[in-house]
Amino acid sequence: MAGHSKWANTKHRKAAQDSKRGKIFTKIIRELVTAARLGGGDPGSNPRLRAAIDKALSNNMTRDTLNRAIARGVGGDDDTNMETIIYEGYGPGGTAVMVECLSDNRNRTVSEVRHAFTKTGGNLGTDGSVSYLFTKKGVISYAPGLDEDTVMNAALEAGADDVVTYDDGAIDVFTPWETFGDVKDALDAAGLKAESAEVSMIPSTKADMDAETAPKLMRLIDMLEDCDDVQEVYHNGEISDEVAELL
């Protein structure tokens, strides 16, 4: 299947993301602690923890750091009572946006999230307003250069739902989120090194961004990601290579 890969769509944001690495690590550690506290320290029986571990490794976190975070969660050493909150809304150009948060103060979190939407011309919606457009799936991404048939055969044999190859040669393997870890292990065992692996919310439809709406969407995403309580931002905005070059 042809199209624009996440690889192409996010290249222009890499420098900005690198500058946020410290904040990204803090958020991943928070997710590791929470996942271990709620579901135990065994990633084999805790899909949420397994997803957090793979995200940590994709972001070059050391095993020592992530193991300490898991131990904190299992041991209950962190007494902060964090809860997962999902906010839904509409961004620039009619984009559907889901914001996943971990918070110990709902009032603070919703205020910060609403401010980001308002400042960028969007608006915070009600529960269910856009979530029906997204499906929770595992996504294992490979950089351009791998043989498509090799990846596809290994992925489908391992239980993947779909394999998508993009114009630039990048490949995404989509899995049921519950078996994400098993599929990732099978692909690793086949010698296929992933560029990233995570559980994500995949949109069923895309909203094309133009030169006017794309910068506004990027600003919304940046403002949300700058919020300490925000763990993930999912959206259905599609930015073409031509528009991305202008950002």
UniProtKB/Swiss-Prot annotation:
Pfam families: TACO1_YebC_N, Transcrip_reg. SUPFAM superfamilies: YebC-like (SSF75625). GO terms for molecular function: DNA binding. One of its GO terms (biological process) is regulation of DNA-templated transcription. It comes from the Bacteria. Keywords: Cytoplasm, DNA-binding, Transcription, Transcription regulation. InterPro entries: Integrase-like_N (IPR017856), TACO1_YebC-like_2nd/3rd_dom (IPR048300), TACO1_YebC_N (IPR049083), Transcrip_reg_TACO1-like (IPR002876), Transcrip_reg_TACO1-like_dom3 (IPR026564), YebC-like (IPR029072). It is found in: Cytoplasm. GO terms for cellular component: cytosol. Transmembrane segments: none annotated. Belongs to the TACO1 family. This is Probable transcriptional regulatory protein ECA2494.
